């Protein structure tokens, strides 16, 4: 599901959450160790979202696909995961706002999963969590020049890697899959 597809779904259904925020919530819950299927996903969404139960029920098939897409991205051995954000055709100020919404959603999802800062195993993951919290406060006061675009791209890449790091720190071996080894003969 693309950012634009999710945005349209949420607008049609009348959700209070933005596409970036909702994807962040789902990824945060995943990073916090939750694996949600069927009614567990529905109940988690009811607990995390401000939107009405009927809206969530109407959109549940699409939200289930988004959940599966997010889990697949976070567990991909090629590190294919990306936060769901608007594309380059969107003005930079709106992309920065969406990034702040995604990071706040991610933090909310982590909190809803029961994760606390003490749960993280490494200093790197704890630092990444602190950086994500700082990005959640991001604003835009630039003029949209190339330098601003480069800064945004670097933040987006950092956010992608930080989310993968936190997820992998807390993931079970079943989430990551069997380790591959290379043997020299």
List each language-model region with its residue ranges:
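Domain-length accessory/inserted modules outside core catalytic folds
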Residues: 1-103, 107-185
